[in-house]
Amino acid sequence: MAKENSKIALDIEGYLKEHENKDMLRFLTCGSVDDGKSTLIGRMLYDSKMIFDDQLSAAEGESRKYGTTGEKLDMALLVDGLQSEREQGITIDVAYRFFATEKRKFIIADTPGHEQYTRNMVTGASTADVAIILIDARKGILTQTRRHSFIVNLLGIEHVIVAINKMDLVDFSEEVFDKISGAYGALADELGIKNTYYIPVSALEGDNVVDRSKRSPWFSGQPLLGLLDSMDISKEPKEEDFRFPVQYVNRPNLDFRGFCGTIAAGLVRTGDEITVLPSGKTTKVKNIVNAGDITEKNRETMTEYAYAPMAVTITTEDEVDISRGDMIVHTKNLPRVSNSLKVMLVWMDETPMEPGKTYDIKRATSVVPGFIEHINYKVDINTYEREQVHRLGLNDIASCKMVLTQPIAADAYETNRLTGSFIVVDRISNDTVGAGMIVGVSRREEDVVKLSAKEYTDAERALNLYVRENFPEWECKVI
């Protein structure tokens, strides 16, 4: 990597420019404990010469102290960063690494295999385009393989690469490879995973990771890095699916008022008719500002159109009441607006979730108080069986009915990851205690929860005022 280091040091601007126009692919590695996830990533980084000299020197020292590969460099130590990870030889936290090839940029999420760290794996999978599921060639499909495959499918990852690892320990047997591939194919069909790819690898020795291996002449496919380089994950932005969660209102002077945020989906042009939700107010896009001095006199900062995931400022032709948490969409393609949602919830806190308790539900830029009205069923992610429960514990995944104190504009998660997902925040500790995906939004009148207006006493109003003035972090609403 010394030559690469010198190149960066001599021409940092050129190095950045070389990579800025490459498309980005995010992938995660998952599988059972000790299947070699961290070793695979370490090998990929090492063989693609993306390890800096100081990182390599540190890893060599740690390898002598904690390594399990004798005199050889323990590739897993290039990724496992926590002291407890190195000492125990396992992955606990989600480790992110960046590297690039001639064709593409990559962000890797190395996720833990242990069941007690399921919430960490969900975090890593939430932004991934591709999942690499490792299977030990000696053990085949295990319970944790089934669990991770379920989570990968639940989070909408459409491409799954099955890396059958430690093939060197079974003499690169084609029979073993075919047996495991067939078994996982049946599992993928059961879950509804559409795009699966199978590669025989040895992460420790580097076979079929970056370069083709001579020890598997019967395998005609691409090595792992070649497959990641050539995989098509692009999706053309659909103009009609425009979603723009408003992050904040920008008013730098009396002559300008714009609405800032990152486009979550679709494409917008100046002159488009838009609707602000949940208020339902309509107007047209006057200008789209994407850089530089934010004034309507500075035409160089304007663009005729913008698309996901660009961060822009939008101005409107009419004075419309828009605030943080609102969503701007095309008038011809409105998402459903409701306060009653069907969700899949992953509970991430040691304190159990009990229906009826109020939490803050953070979806995109909006934060709305809400609660779980009913748990439909909990999924046993090892057997895929549904269980009836009254509350959720750490790492539980369940189908629930969630009710909010006010309606929001929402999409199903399978349609839009950003506007169809949310986190659950404890209102007292401010801890993130859960994460979820919107499965359905109630449209039928009888399904929408009616939150009737309540008549408050003078004492209740006084208490409300006291809480708002002295505990603003509670974000208590005005009554």
From Swiss-Prot:
Gene Ontology terms, MF aspect: ATP binding; GTP binding; GTPase activity; sulfate adenylyltransferase (ATP) activity
Region (G5): 202-204
GO BP field: hydrogen sulfide biosynthetic process; sulfate assimilation
Alphabetical keyword list: ATP-binding, GTP-binding, Nucleotide-binding, Nucleotidyltransferase, Transferase
Region (G1): 31-38
Domain tr-type G: residue ranges: 22-238
InterPro entries noted in UniProt: CysN_GTP-bd (IPR041757), CysN_II (IPR044138), CysN_NoDQ_III (IPR044139), G_TR_CS (IPR031157), GTP-eEF1A_C (IPR054696), P-loop_NTPase (IPR027417), SO4_adenylTrfase_lsu (IPR011779), T_Tr_GTP-bd_dom (IPR000795)
Region (G4): 165-168
Annotated region (G3), positions in chain: 110-113
Disulfide bond sites: none
Pathway recorded for this protein: Sulfur metabolism; hydrogen sulfide biosynthesis; sulfite from sulfate: step 1/3
Region (G2): 89-93
Residue numbers binding GTP: 31-38, 110-114, 165-168
EC number, UniProt record: 2.7.7.4
Family as reported in the entry's similarity comment: Belongs to the TRAFAC class translation factor GTPase superfamily. Classic translation factor GTPase family. CysN/NodQ subfamily.
HAMAP family: Sulf_adenylyltr_sub1
Subunit field text: Heterodimer composed of CysD, the smaller subunit, and CysN.
Function: With CysD forms the ATP sulfurylase (ATPS) that catalyzes the adenylation of sulfate producing adenosine 5'-phosphosulfate (APS) and diphosphate, the first enzymatic step in sulfur assimilation pathway. APS synthesis involves the formation of a high-energy phosphoric-sulfuric acid anhydride bond driven by GTP hydrolysis by CysN coupled to ATP hydrolysis by CysD.
Record's protein name: Sulfate adenylyltransferase subunit 1
Species of origin: Sulfurovum sp. (strain NBC37-1)
